[in-house]
Amino acid sequence: MKKKEMFLDYKSLVKSSLIAVVKHALNKTSEYGISDGHHFYITFDTTYSKNEMPQYLKKDYPKTMMIVIENEFWNLKVDQEFFSVDLKFKGKIDHLKIYFSSVKTFVDPSLSFTLNLDIEDKVIYKKSDAKTKILKKKQIENKSNIIFLKPKSS
């Protein structure tokens, strides 16, 4: 393992779990349509280089854009890395391809459900060094956190 590489990168684990929720909701919507009052507000980074959208939308939304998936959407397709959908803007249907890594928020207001995928680049949880040293010392003295397994005798 490289020195800079984290053994447990919680930020990445949380982000990939949140993206999995978004994918699941969009997959179900793609397969069965949307019902029961559900609708989605999805905010994404329009500066993300892989996203595909008409130039006039990039100009109108230079940093972020929120789309609504409710009544007027077509051809919703969900891929491993992105989703694509046709939406109506200014009376015209346009195709958007949005990478999950650019999604900032996912909201289903029918359930007051909000996911914030815009996780900051800082450690989510960090113990102070002093507390960590005390805890390690207690664990070594106590050894209650160690489990020994004996191989089965033949």
Map each language-model feature to its residues:
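Short hinge/gating elements
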Residues: 3-9
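Conserved NTP-handling cores and scaffolds of large molecular machines
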Residues: 29, 107-110
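Short amphipathic alpha-helical patches
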Residues: 45-53, 120, 124-131
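Short hydrophobic short-linear motifs embedded
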Residues: 6, 123-153
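Phosphoinositide-dependent membrane-docking surfaces
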Residues: 97-107
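N-terminal functional modules and adjacent low-complexity/disordered segments of proteins
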Residues: 21, 108, 141-144
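Short acidic, Gly/Pro-enriched loop/turn segments at secondary-structure junctions
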Residues: 109-121
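N-terminal recruitment modules of adaptor/scaffold proteins
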Residues: 11-97
